[in-house]
Structure formats: structure tokens, C-alpha cells
Amino acid sequence: MTKTDRVCVGAIAGAFGVKGEVRLKSFCTEPTDIASYGPLSTEKGDRSFRVTLTRPVAGGLGARLSDVTTKEEADALRGVGLYVDRARLPSLGDDEFYHADLIGLEVRDTGGALLGRVHAVHNHGAGDILEVAGAAGREGLLLPFTRAVVPTVDLAAGRIVADPPEGLD
């Protein structure tokens, strides 16, 4: 299975309490869906966990992970990404994309000039933002992932066409 066959759906933010519960940050559109995708695995695939959500907590969800029973075990998992096989995820609608599919795409402006490549996708509550690592001689930039700024995403061609707002290009 290649990395593109798996999608990161969340991360462990740290221990919650003293009995092995964790604070889970879900990257799913509906945060609680993370528990419905079956066992989640680490990036390397060397560990997998069944997830049982316990309650909402500040910055995420409280959860129990199979085989994690102590605070120390939960603390050791801080920062670990949780992945699922792409086949277990729901189908996407038109103009919807998994963040993993956007990372690495070439970004060009509407005139064809290379701006760089998508390095990361962030969401701080107001919508997705593409972090573009600049092409040679160009600074990186942050682009709001809206139809106005990113009119074209062509996964098959591996490219994005962007129309950066005045002052960002």
C-alpha cells in the first residue's frame, strides 16, 4: 500500500486524564466521523488502534485507543498522525479534495508562471489555506483555498491554477 492509498484523518494531541485516554484532533469534516472508519494506524502502519470517543474536550475529542491504558502510554503518542485506507473514506463531491491529494501539486498563476508547490493545507476555522513553497527565486505564500483564488485543481495533471489576491503574487 502506498502513502497515497492512506489519508491522515487525525492526530493524537496528548494524554487526557490519568487512565490512558487521549485528546484527539480530528481532521474530518464531521469530527466524530473519525471513530467510524475502523482501526486507524500510524503513518508507518506499525501500530493500529480502535477508537472509542468519550466526550468533547477543549481542542478536540476525548478518546480511548485500544491497547493504551496508562497516561504514560498516551503521552508517548503525542503528535502521532492517524491514518485510514482511502477505500474506507466516503466519496467526495465535485470540487472537494482530500488535503493529502493537494500536497505536492504544482501551483501556477493564471498567466502560467510557476509559483511553487503545495507544501501543506491549514485550517484555522475560517477555511482552508494552501501553504505554497516558493519556486526558485520566489518566496512562499499562503493562498485561501476558495474558488476565486484557486479556480482550477487538476489532480490528473498534478497542478493548481491560482489567481492570488493583489499583493500576494
UniProtKB/Swiss-Prot annotation:
GO terms for cellular component: cytoplasm; ribosome. GO terms for molecular function: ribosome binding. InterPro entries: PRC_barrel-like_sf (IPR011033), PRC_RimM (IPR056792), RimM (IPR011961), RimM_N (IPR002676), RimM_N_sf (IPR036976), Transl_B-barrel_sf (IPR009000). It is found in: Cytoplasm. GO terms for biological process: ribosomal small subunit biogenesis; rRNA processing. The PRC barrel domain binds ribosomal protein uS19. NCBIfam families: 16S_RimM (TIGR02273). Belongs to the RimM family. This is Ribosome maturation factor RimM. The gene is rimM.
